[in-house]
Amino acid sequence: MQSSHAAAAVSSAFDDPNLIAYGGLEPVVRLAERCGLPALVGEHVRLPASNDGTGAFPAAKLMSLVGGMAAGADSIDDMDRLRHGAMGRLFSGVRAPSTLGSFLRSFTHGHVKQLHAVARRFLHELARHTPLLPGADQAAYVDIDDTIRRTHGYAKQGAGYGYSKVKGLNALLGVVSTPLSAPVIAATRLRKGPSNSARGAAAFVAETIRTARSCGASGLLVLRADSAFYGADVINACRALGARFSITMRMNASVKATIARIDEDAWTPIKYPQAVWDEEGQCWISDAEIAEILYTAFTSKPKKQQVTARLIARRVKRLSAGTVPAGQGTLFDTWRYHAAFTDSPLALRDAERDHRRHAVVEQVIADVKNSGYRDWLQAA
C-alpha cells in the first residue's frame, strides 16, 4: 500500500527583516558600554598590524564576541546570529564570523594577558555601576580551584593528560562571593593539560585578591581552597595582601599526630544542615564533631616561610553497618578526619562552616561546563 498523493512541500524561513531574536542583548550591551568595555579594549589590547587588517578595530570585534556568547553562540559560525533579521538595525559594528575567527587566531599569550587586564578593570567598573557584591565591605570570600576540560584531536595545542587521566586543558578559576551575593568569576587561567594544580597559584591568588579589593571587598577577605593549593607560597601571598586563608590540609603524618593530641573533651558535636553522601563509606552522614589546635606548617622551609595558625579538624563516624552482623554493635566508634588550616578570626563553628562553603566554586565550574561557554573553553 502506498500514498496516492504527493506530500505537500513545507518550508520554514526565519529571515524576517523586522525580527529581533535576541532583544535581551540590548541592556547587556548598554551596560557593557556604560562600564567602558569598548574603551578599555581600545586602550589595552594592541594587536600587530597586518595587510588583511586582522588586528584592526579590536573593540568592535570583542564586543561582537561578547554579544554572540551572551546570545548563546557556542562556535565561531554561530556568531552569524548577530546579523540575523533586524539585529543589524539594533546594533552597529557587528563583524562577520570569518573576521572574528581570524581575529582570535591572531592572539598570542601576551594578547591574552592584555584581555586579562581588560577583564580586571571591567569588573571594577561593573561593581561601581551595579550591586555586584553586596556586603563586600563587611566580608567576602575568594575561592580558587581548577578543572580539566576534555579536548579532541592530536594536534590541540597544550592538550595533555592531567590528574583526571583525561586528555584536555587545565582551567584555573578564581571566584569572589559574599554571604549576600552570587559568586562572580574574578580571574581565569587556561593552562596545559598536564599542569599541576598549584602551578603559578601564588601569583594567581594575588591577582584575584587585588581584583576583589578593587571591587569593594574592603572588609574581611578569606581565601578558600582545597589541599591541592596547600603551600607556603599561596598562604604567604594571602598574608602579603592582608587577606585571610582557609585551606584544606593534606593528611600527612605531622597533621595526623597533631590531631591525635587533641583532648577527647575538646571535640564539639555539630549537625550538618543537610545530609552529605560519604563516598568512602558509601552512606549518608548527618553529624560530625569539630575541634581546633595550633599548628605550625611548612617547618622544613626557612623560618620566614613557616606559618603558625589554627588547625580545624572535623571527624565523622565511620558508619559501616553492612559489615556488622545483624543484632550486633561495634565495640568502639572509629572516625575519619578532615583538616583545614586557617587564620580566620571567626569562632570555631563559623570558621569550619565557612570553610565547607568553598564548594561554591565547584558549582561555578559545573555551570561553566554545562553552559554554552564550555565549547569556548574547549576551542580556546
Please place each PLM-identified region on the residue numbering.
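An anionic, glycine-rich sequence signature occurring as long contiguous blocks
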Residues: 2-6, 10, 14, 244-368, ...
